[in-house]
UniProtKB/Swiss-Prot annotation:
Part of the ribosomal stalk of the 50S ribosomal subunit. Interacts with L10 and the large rRNA to form the base of the stalk. L10 forms an elongated spine to which L12 dimers bind in a sequential fashion forming a multimeric L10(L12)X complex. Belongs to the universal ribosomal protein uL11 family. HAMAP family: Ribosomal_uL11. This is Large ribosomal subunit protein uL11. One or more lysine residues are methylated. One of its GO terms (molecular function) is large ribosomal subunit rRNA binding. The gene is rplK. It holds the Pfam family Ribosomal_L11_N. NCBIfam families: L11_bact. SUPFAM superfamilies: Ribosomal L11/L12e N-terminal domain (SSF54747), Ribosomal protein L11, C-terminal domain (SSF46906). Keywords: Methylation, Ribonucleoprotein, Ribosomal protein, RNA-binding, rRNA-binding. GO terms for biological process: translation. PROSITE patterns: RIBOSOMAL_L11 (PS00359).
Length: 142
């Protein structure tokens, strides 16, 4: 018989840097999950990613207090800021541009995000990511 699911917890945790401090500790503690066990497993799974890259994770907590988790790809906005070499997006994206991304960079981000995005094809994903870039005040070349 399958285990009974008690809760789903969605968090964004820095890759390779999960620790019991907030937001991880309180979110897992209220469901009775072993926090250090999660931190060790998460850090081991994300060691191949760039350290500190915000990584969405969905944790499934079962009634016997065991858990499983699935890591997602980093948010498109984070990948776009990294590609453009900017610290943050523009406060006024229509008038104030803060950086530039090329079509090749958008293609690379779309391929990275392909596993998580529900787009029909790579072109649709590229358009979605280009739209995100424009809404952040980035100029899309190509």
């Amino acid at each position: 018989m399958a285990k009974k699911v008690e809760a789903y917890i969605k968090l964004q945790v820095a890759a390779g840097a999960a620790n019991p401090s907030p937001p991880v500790g309180p979110a897992l503690g209220q469901h009775g999950v072993n926090i250090m066990e999660f931190c060790k497993a998460f850090n081991a799974k994300t060691e191949s990613l760039e350290k500190g890259l915000p990584t969405p994770v969905v944790i499934t907590v079962y009634s016997d207090r065991s858990f499983t988790f699935v890591t997602k790809t980093p948010p498109a906005a984070v990948l776009l800021k990294k590609a453009a070499g900017v610290k943050s997006g523009s406060g006024r994206p229509n008038t104030e541009k803060v950086g530039t991304v090329t079509d090749a960079q958008i293609q690379e981000i779309a391929e990275t995000k392909a596993a998580d995005m529900t787009g029909a094809d790579i072109e649709a994903m590229k358009r979605s990511i280009a739209g995100t870039a424009r809404s952040m005040g980035l100029v899309v070349e190509g």
